[in-house]
């Protein structure tokens, strides 16, 4: 009998199996494709210049290395850099403009967010 959901699995094993895909230029891999949640593993070695915001919270878990979440608090003011280190988690509230910076080439992070509606 099959389950209507996936079974638990070893996340570190999954990362090790897909590590070669977590390099620039794309540097990310979505774990589940048919879900209302976007659960992706993101590799390092890249810097973004764009900012975006989400209408719902976004969860960050840094598995290996470190990353900087650049947060734009107020227009016209410099951004605030929030470092997230290996083993740390952070829940970004909705509506905050941010730009994930993954300069650490050995960094690996898990990002969970709600799927965005089309349009």
Q: What residues fall within each predicted segment?
A:
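A short, N-terminal "cap"/entry segment at the start of jelly-roll beta-barrel domains
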Residues: 1-43, 48-50
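Short acidic-glycine-tyrosine-enriched beta hairpin
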Residues: 73-94
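Ligand-binding loop in jelly-roll beta-barrel domains
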Residues: 94-118
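His/acidic/aromatic-lined binding-pocket segments of jelly-roll/cupin-type domains
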Residues: 39, 50-52, 57-62, 81-82, ...
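Short, conserved beta-strand element in jelly-roll/cupin
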Residues: 42-44, 53-73, 109-115
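Short secondary-structure capping micro-motifs at structural edges
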Residues: 28, 46-48, 57, 79-80, ...
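Cyclic nucleotide-binding regulatory domains
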Residues: 71, 87, 100-102
């Amino acid at each position: 009998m099959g389950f209507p959901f996936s079974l638990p699995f070893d996340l570190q094993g999954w990362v090790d199996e897909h590590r070669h895909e977590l390099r620039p230029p794309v540097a990310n891999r979505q774990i589940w494709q048919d879900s209302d949640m976007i659960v992706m593993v993101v590799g390092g070695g890249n810097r973004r210049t764009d900012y975006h915001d989400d209408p719902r919270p976004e969860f960050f878990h840094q598995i290996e290395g470190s990353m900087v979440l650049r947060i734009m608090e107020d227009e016209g003011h410099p951004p605030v850099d929030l470092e997230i280190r290996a083993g740390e988690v952070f829940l970004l509230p909705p509506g905050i403009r941010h730009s994930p910076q993954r300069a650490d080439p050995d960094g690996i992070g898990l990002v969970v967010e709600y799927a965005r509606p089309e349009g």
